[in-house]
Regions:
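Short, well-ordered alpha-helix to beta-strand connector turns
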Residues: 148, 206, 255-257
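Catalytic donor nucleotide-activated moiety binding site of glycosyltransferases and closely related
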Residues: 155-158, 184-238
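A donor-sugar binding/catalytic signature common to diverse glycosyltransferases
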Residues: 15, 19, 246-291
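Short, flexible loop segments at the rims of nucleotide/cofactor-binding pockets, characterized by
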Residues: 130-131, 235-241
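Short beta-alpha junction loops
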Residues: 36-42, 195-197, 290-292
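Active-site rim elements
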Residues: 5-9, 238-239, 243
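Secretory-pathway glycan-assembly enzymes, especially type II membrane glycosyltransferases
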Residues: 1-188
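A structural signal for short, well-ordered beta-strand segments and their strand-loop junctions
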Residues: 4, 31-36, 152-154, 190-192, ...
Length: 293
């Protein structure tokens, strides 16, 4: 049996899915193959994220001329991976139940990974197998060496309707509460978001706050619509550069012992997994998801 991991959704979902699939492939002592389509949610190629020997297969006939697709909406997209039509037994690892239809293939079993779980594979093994490219690691290292962040405040602004207006941002007490409830932060507070306005505003209100000055931010697919429409459809376009910025943010987060999130963030959770792996004696380190007040 071959273990295929279908990486879809955003970067955080994909990292957790890879982690789960790696663990399963080790347990079964079988080959792991990665399917990493370039999509609106994650516009970076697999080989631009990692230096790895893991095999990758490319989808056929689903990439429009501009190179980006929405996956998971039309079942036929998955069947355009010809390997899934073979008779060889396949275990497909997916991060959501949106590909339940794959279970109808007689040669395919499906395992749905839940990124809320603790990592199934040893993080040491994950980081050795999927080595983040030096260009991302070096930029994160440079920021950490210069700013020495102790804690992270991570705000998702584009695809989660957490803070709708500037006034809401000013009135938010949840963020202030989560900073104070654990006691005084012992060093710099790294503030990161996928919307610049949140970084610009929050850095004014917290002493010892630091932000990355050289990053870019995601853009809208339709400028006339908000990032998240009333119907819940994503109006977001994360280019390769945008995802690279998220990787760097995640790597910086993974150097901080306290991570506060404005919404549930699979990316922040993964950063915390890395920190706990590299600092096993820091039992007081935590990731906390704090709701909007």
């Amino acid at each position: 049996m071959t273990v295929y991991v279908l990486c879809h959704g955003g970067l955080g979902n994909r990292l957790h899915c890879l982690n789960t699939a790696l663990a399963i492939s080790k347990i079964l002592d079988t080959q792991l193959v990665v399917c990493w389509p370039v999509t609106y949610e994650c516009g970076i190629a697999f080989r631009d994220v990692f230096d790895t020997d893991i095999e990758e297969i490319l989808a056929t006939d689903i990439q429009p001329t501009h190179g980006y697709v929405r996956i998971g909406l039309i079942p036929d997209h998955i069947t355009d991976y010809p390997q899934f039509k073979d008779d060889l037994p396949i275990l497909l690892v997916s991060v959501t139940t949106s590909h339940r239809f794959m279970m109808s293939f007689r040669n395919v079993d499906v395992y749905f990974s839940d990124h809320k779980d603790r990592p199934l594979s040893d993080m040491k093994e994950f980081l050795e197998t999927f080595r983040f490219k030096d260009e991302h690691v070096n930029r994160a290292d440079e920021f950490v060496q210069k700013n020495s962040p102790y804690a992270t405040l991570h705000i998702r602004g584009t695809d989660v309707p957490f803070i709708q207006t500037e006034m809401d941002l000013m009135k938010t007490t949840a963020i202030q509460h989560m900073i104070l409830k654990k006691g005084t932060i012992r060093g710099n507070l790294f503030i990161c978001s996928d919307e610049k306005k949140y970084e610009d505003e929050l850095v004014k209100y917290y002493h010892h706050a630091v932000v990355r000055q050289d990053k870019t931010y995601p853009s809208k697919r339709d400028e006339n619509l908000p990032f998240l429409t009333d119907k819940g459809e994503y109006n977001i376009f994360r280019t390769s550069q945008d995802v690279a910025e998220a990787i760097i943010d995640m790597l910086i987060m993974s150097r901080t012992c306290q991570i506060y999130g404005s919404t549930y963030s699979s990316l922040a959770r993964f950063a915390h997994f890395i920190y706990r792996h590299k600092n096993p004696d820091h039992t007081w380190a935590f990731y906390e998801h704090v709701q909007h007040a």
